[in-house]
């Protein structure tokens, strides 16, 4: 039974330990076979004859205590091998009580959450009613003064009711009452489909002003992502605002409640699956036991399971049905297909054309690299004079795409291995269900960028050597700029193409990182900032793009950027910004979480900022005496940074180097079964960390061009980051498993004052 492949990885410790129970059954079977080999056939055959003749005796006796703990008494301990079976039933009881207790606790949690969502729905419906009433009165008043045309009035039947009441000389109350009754015709079965029979809507039906009483006791919670609300949270100012009845507010409220319903439905689905899989596991293991021992214990034990909360509770199913009915009615206008697609998105199908396209682009990249090497060799393009000029100008432009492609390849490898070892990366990053990219999609994007960049390089070299296009040198120099602009356009295009949800998620996270510490720091925010820390050379290349094309150097293929004081100043800022952004994020987390460890982490990034700035000072300063000082100080601070960062990587980010662990110098829980992988990863991390010091110390190699050394070191840092990514998320996943954290917290739109 492939039991482990179906359960939620965050709850894996709460499931029946089927594997261990199976080993106990094998022990019983091994003893039975050993007994049979030594003359135990007679007793076994007599047992079989008794069963065939209908003479059966009870094997087990099940009971439950006042503390809702189930116990099994094994009645055949006097038989040979009875002690093995006794151990089996004791462990079976422990496993069953564990899952039953966990399930009962989770059911209690979802019932409480259902009550909270119930109150939120009351407030939403009251909000809608209030808006409808205000809109009706407003339209009726405008119609009375001739502002609204008869055609517009005819479109809204409820407005017509109000007009008739007003024209008869009566008050608008009749119209309001009629409109309210029409609304409740649609909402009259709200109590039947939602969570609790005692619903505040019944009070609303008894009085036209009852819903106002609900609205009087609530306020709107500010949107979680809003800059203002996050600033207020740091300043300890209330994040609750008075109700404003506008369509924009209604839209935001509905969006939040939709997210809450989706997450709540997902939790119910997990619980339903949890109950089914555990009952199935218990049934399977007891069937195996009965088959080996020729007893009939499964029937008695499964009766106890069926009577327990795990086997008999129908609260989850009822809640799920009610949630689905309410969601479909309130948010999709009764369209069940649309509603269920939102609540339970269908998994994406693997498309063969994606596999083919990814492989095709990978083959194209390999062919283009071979062609590039052949062209450079045969045409002798990069001669002594041209090589220096090309390496100082065109190489930094094109290496940008190489760094991006390499990083995406490493990320694709991360996704592949996360899936292999069941790391729930989509939950950790907070991706919307069904929108996360797979490793093939990431490879497709990365290979597309790589293939286009190589095509541009070949086109550039070919246009330079071709007499017909040699006069268009300025145009050939613009090819990398055109590609960079095309990438930027694809990244920000608002249309639903090119993985829009992933692009929007990336841009939102990037904005949060740039605006640190004004936004609450989440894992995607600091994870992206860490990626940019390893892409410092890419950021410098972008600055070089602005200088090279903005100041017109591309027309003569000259690099005069480093002669500019402005360029050198921004070089400091660009190089240090990712690390400084991480420092600000650490400070924000330290203030919010009251965690001093975040302060130490922030100090680590400040040391890196100092080391990077000293390295930049050594690079741009022409005075040899000062260069020696900059290099010495840079070497000291970079060595401090490397030691500090290496320790933090291994101990805090990866959770390794635990002396008291059952896996010496690693950690208790390891997803990869081969421990040597962790040792190798630690060694590689240390070596590549020290290789990073080359960016600060800038050692010269006579046989290798400086730009080549820079590109190699930057690539090694990207590879190190890719390795770091896997173990960082593995550790985060194991923390979630230890805390049974399988669902994200969702902010609700309404805040009931009486609750606080």
Curated annotation (Swiss-Prot):
One BP annotation, GO: phosphate ion transport
Per UniProt, the keywords (alphabetical) are: Cell membrane, Membrane, Phosphate transport, Transmembrane, Transmembrane helix, Transport
- Statement: the UniProt record of this protein carries the keyword Cell membrane: yes
- Principal cellular location given in the protein's record: membrane
How the protein sits in the membrane? Multi-pass membrane protein
- What is a single molecular function from GO for this protein? phosphate transmembrane transporter activity
Cytoplasmic compartment spans: 1-355, 418-440, 499-631, 698-756
List, for all copies, the residue spans of the domain called EXS.
562-756
- Report domain SPX positions: 1-303
What PANTHER family does the record point to?
PHOSPHATE TRANSPORTER PHO1 HOMOLOG 6, XENOTROPIC AND POLYTROPIC RETROVIRUS RECEPTOR 1-RELATED
What does this gene product do?
May transport inorganic phosphate (Pi).
The molecule here is called Phosphate transporter PHO1 homolog 6
